[in-house]
Amino acid sequence: MATKIRLARAGAKRKPFYQVVVADERCKRDGRFIENVGTYDPNQNPAVFKLEEAKTLEWLGKGAQPTDTVKQILKKAGIWEKFVSKLA
């Protein structure tokens, strides 16, 4: 089972709010997920993201692949650098 760390859309029309979730890559965007690891609110200025660092690092260690957007969020939060330094 290939897992992805990706955004699941929530919120109202024209007011998106996203949950950062770990899901099987075959599931729908807003469908079933394995675990919720954070949130992302692009409506705030600047955009607000809250991630559970321990859970995120655990899933990255298990081989979950982040999408491009989530990878950028992880870099801004500093989690991606911690993961890469653990690998080295």
UniProtKB/Swiss-Prot annotation:
Classification via HAMAP family: Ribosomal_bS16
Annotated GO biological process: translation
GO molecular function: structural constituent of ribosome
Pfam family, one: Ribosomal_S16
Superkingdom assignment: Bacteria
UniProt-listed SUPFAM superfamilies: Ribosomal protein S16
Protein's recorded name: Small ribosomal subunit protein bS16
Record keywords: Ribonucleoprotein, Ribosomal protein
Similarity-based family: Belongs to the bacterial ribosomal protein bS16 family.
InterPro entries, sorted: Ribosomal_bS16 (IPR000307), Ribosomal_bS16_CS (IPR020592), Ribosomal_bS16_dom_sf (IPR023803)
Gene3D superfamilies: 3.30.1320.10
Gene responsible for this protein: rpsP
